[in-house]
Curated annotation (Swiss-Prot):
It comes from Aspergillus terreus (strain NIH 2624 / FGSC A1156). Its cofactor is heme. Keywords: Heme, Iron, Membrane, Metal-binding, Monooxygenase, Oxidoreductase, Transmembrane, Transmembrane helix. GO terms for cellular component: membrane. The fungal sesquiterpenoid aspterric acid (AA) is a submicromolar inhibitor of dihydroxy-acid dehydratase (DHAD) in plants and is effective as an herbicide in spray applications. It holds the Pfam family p450. Its EC number is 1.-.-.-. Belongs to the cytochrome P450 family. PANTHER family: CYTOCHROME P450, N-ACETYLTRYPTOPHAN 6-HYDROXYLASE IVOC-RELATED. This is Cytochrome P450 monooxygenase astB. It is an enzyme of class 1 (oxidoreductase).
Length: 512
């Protein structure tokens, strides 16, 4: 009855007034009554997530630099939005990203941008995540990855051959490495690959779809419902909204075809596949009687496959690009790497194993430096201690508080890595000789019970890929400077201020 007596303008005014009162009340609560009210940080950042939204959505993934400024002004622990804290302290990283001894949940906003709600990486609850991870983790053990090294070498044979054929031409090494990593990771998950290395100019739809998702990451993190709705719209409508959106759906349909291709096989064929080769994740999971039926649904398999594939493609490809940039940009480093690898050269017809390359100190230094300066996920991935209060620097962090650190800030901390922007494999060699474990501070794969599932596969692709490409081909950088691989925008992964971070080179030919 109250609103019936109001004119339309008055009713609109009443609604806006109610909204204004609600917003004001929320601001007052966040500033003066919230459990985090006494933590350091600018007051504007403590009000909802407006400040974060402005820098990550409006200004395209630049909140990291504001957080860095906060630490410079307020110290190692700061409140970065109404309910979250950020800490910059390499020694405290393992406390936030804890192992199996303490429960850690994920924050909803941290996984909303993935748009794969049924995947392990998007699972919020600690216990459900542990169960889901246990299903697939055996297929990513060092032993399991060692068994697919022949496939990795076969793909590298094709990659090196294609690059050699481009003698005198300019190639996009990042795209080439993306095709290589895509072939390996899809083969491991599905038991087959699409020969992305054979695609023209190393361009393929799956990579384009990933680029679309990354460009949308910051928006979908704040607005997940519209993003998930888009996936279900017809392709023509998606194309009208954005010409690149259909690429995402097409990639999902291609993955769906692979899954259904196995699900629809006769039982005899499934058994033959399992008996012949049970190394692929999907074949192994679907034929494992210990895996609950609820974990074998089409949505689960699609989401799981897509997150493993997308995560396994771009991070490794970018790291390979960073490695080759620095090797080609500093020929002394390249020559030293070749010399050390020549000392452990294999007879004709034989290839290095990952284990053999890991034992070469300088090779290990090159790989670790590439990983450090590629950063992995550069966005904040908060962890929540649901029941236990954390203590840091005199502060008691209430249970249920999202707390995070930045891989970029840790990897560039001069107290751990002097001259952090310098690509210096010797820092790892010297640290090992001095009995210092820099691995403790290698956080590009995150840490703890939710650390990167595919770390062993990533290392295999990196060791074998860097060693073979660096010793097989002579190349020169083409119109690629350090700015091309620098970090300015954080869209899940690191992006430079301009361009897509591609490393380009002119192929001079095979090494003599």
């Amino acid at each position: 009855m109250l609103f019936q007596d109001l004119s339309f303008p008055a009713a609109i005014g009443a609604v806006f007034g109610a909204v204004a009162i609600s917003v004001a009340a929320r601001c007052i609560y966040d500033l003066f009554f919230h459990p985090l009210r006494n933590f350091p940080g600018p007051k504007r950042a403590a009000i909802w997530s407006f400040y974060e939204f402005y820098y990550d959505v409006i200004r395209d993934g630049t909140y990291l630099w504001e957080i860095e400024k906060m630490h410079q002004k307020y110290g190692p622990i700061v409140r970065i939005n109404s309910r979250s804290l950020h800490i910059h302290d390499p020694e405290y990283f393992n406390t936030i990203y804890a192992g199996s001894g303490r429960k850690v949940n994920k924050e909803l906003s941290a996984v909303s941008g993935y748009t794969f709600p049924h995947s392990t990486i998007s699972t919020l609850d600690h216990d459900l995540h542990r169960k889901r991870r246990a299903i697939v983790s055996p297929y990513f053990s060092k032993r399991a990855i060692a068994e697919i090294e022949p496939v990795i070498h076969e793909r590298l044979n094709v990659l090196i051959s294609r690059l050699a054929e481009a003698k005198g031409s300019i190639v996009d090494l990042t795209s080439a490495f993306s095709a290589y990593t895509a072939d390996v990771v899809t083969y491991h998950f599905y038991g087959t690959h699409a020969n992305y290395i054979g695609s023209k100019d190393f361009k393929y739809g799956l990579k384009d779809a990933l680029t679309v998702l990354l460009n949308l990451y910051n928006l979908t993190r704040f607005l997940p419902v519209p993003a998930n709705t888009l996936k279900n719209l017809p392709l023509p409508i998606l194309g009208l909204i954005n010409p690149n959106f259909p690429l995402v759906v097409s990639a999902r349909e291609a993955n769906k075809k692979m899954v259904l291709g196995y699900l629809n096989k006769p039982d005899e064929d499934k058994k033959a596949m399992k008996d012949a080769r049970s190394k692929s994740v999907i074949v192994s999971a679907l034929t494992d009687p210990n895996v609950p039926d609820a974990e074998k649904t089409l949505d689960r398999l699609l989401d799981e496959g897509e997150t493993i594939i997308f995560a396994g493609i771009d991070t490794t490809a970018r790291t390979l690009g960073v490695a080759l940039f620095h090797l080609l940009n500093n020929k002394d480093v390249l020559m030293k790497l070749r010399k050390e690898l020549q000392a452990v050269a294999k007879p004709d017809g034989q290839q290095w194993t990952t284990t053999e390359l890991e034992a070469v100190p300088y090779m290990r230094g090159v790989v670790q430096e590439a990983i450090r300066l590629a950063y992995g996920l550069v966005v904040r991935i908060p962890r929540i201690s649901p029941h236990e209060a954390l203590r840091y620097n005199g502060f008691v962090i209430p249970p249920g508080t999202p707390v995070s650190q930045s891989t970029y800030l840790v990897n560039n901390d001069p107290s751990v890595f002097p001259n952090p922007q310098v690509f210096d494999p010797e820092r790892w060699v010297k640290a090992a000789q001095d009995g210092v474990s820099l691995d403790k501070y290698m956080v590009s794969f995150s840490k703890g019970s939710r650390g990167c599932l595919g770390i062993n596969l990533a290392y295999a692709k990196l060791y074998l890929g860097i060693a073979r490409v660096a010793t097989s081909l002579d190349m020169e950088l083409f119109e690629t400077t350090a700015k091309a691989i620098s970090v300015y925008h954080t869209r899940g992964f690191a992006f430079p201020k301009e361009g897509d971070g591609a490393v380009k080179a002119r192929v001079m030919g095979l090494c003599k």
